[in-house]
């Protein structure tokens, strides 16, 4: 008798299955809603922060202090007419933004916001799952560039693919160093391992944290590495032909990946949901509050850099990723491993 027959034959098991499915569905819907709201208001925060840095007011007309601006933008994009170029590959043109958007949400299923707040805890492959999902996102961009039948979109897609692959190496290797230090692949255990990690070891991981952060900037196509969307060269890059909700999906996917990358940096290098320096006096504040504050701090650095730095040339971008960051990360992994063995601090 098959498993399905066993479930149907046993009424209790069927009820349990339905109940568990309902609970998981509610959690997934709640996570998606929270992520969409966070993404929408990250765009608002970006416009406000950059406006203040440039001595402007920023969005201020839609609602008090402009707080309804993201809703106004969403309504505008929903009701805009979706335009598909006559010579575009219609099916691929529509599928591309969906791929990018869905993959940007999948990584959140294993992110622990607190010790007990995680949608799906994968004990062995949480890190591998996030790396795999974020790496697949480039396929949506490549498909968009190809399907648009535009030289600007195609060049933007090629740039994006090369850029993501180049910086994926440095980012993944910086995470490997964390796995060597903690001896864990479970994201929650990685955070818990930072409770007892010596302070000198935390300081030694800071250069890798900086390289990881810069790699995330390149991976999410943010300034100073927004070469795939360089306005002065490619108009808008791979999404130049997109409008309406298709454009919104690319937009939301980019910002969702920013938040995901910041969350992973918080877990790997900043103690996740633990208080700063694991101070006992601060443990009365819930872990998810610390997690949100740390992620917000990393995201502010994204916005600060966008308002401050000019765009790199493409050759400088590739040189930095392959000839500077990659050797540094490899050398640093060797140094950290040797120190762990010498000091008898292997996990």
UniProtKB/Swiss-Prot annotation:
Transmembrane parts of this sequence: 22-42, 59-79, 93-113, 124-144, 171-191, 198-218, 240-260, 285-305, 321-341
Reaction(s) this enzyme catalyzes, per UniProt: a quinone + NADH + 5 H(+)(in) = a quinol + NAD(+) + 4 H(+)(out)
Sample GO molecular function, one term: NADH dehydrogenase activity
GO-annotated cellular components: plasma membrane
UniProt keyword terms in alphabetical order: Cell inner membrane, Cell membrane, Membrane, NAD, Quinone, Translocase, Transmembrane, Transmembrane helix, Ubiquinone
One Pfam family linked to the record: NADHdh
A GO BP annotation: aerobic respiration
Subcellular location: Cell inner membrane
NCBIfam families assigned: PRK06076.1-2 (NF004741), PRK06076.1-6 (NF004745)
Record-stated family: Belongs to the complex I subunit 1 family.
Subunit relationships: NDH-1 is composed of 14 different subunits. Subunits NuoA, H, J, K, L, M, N constitute the membrane sector of the complex.
Record's protein name: NADH-quinone oxidoreductase subunit H
Organism: Orientia tsutsugamushi (strain Ikeda)
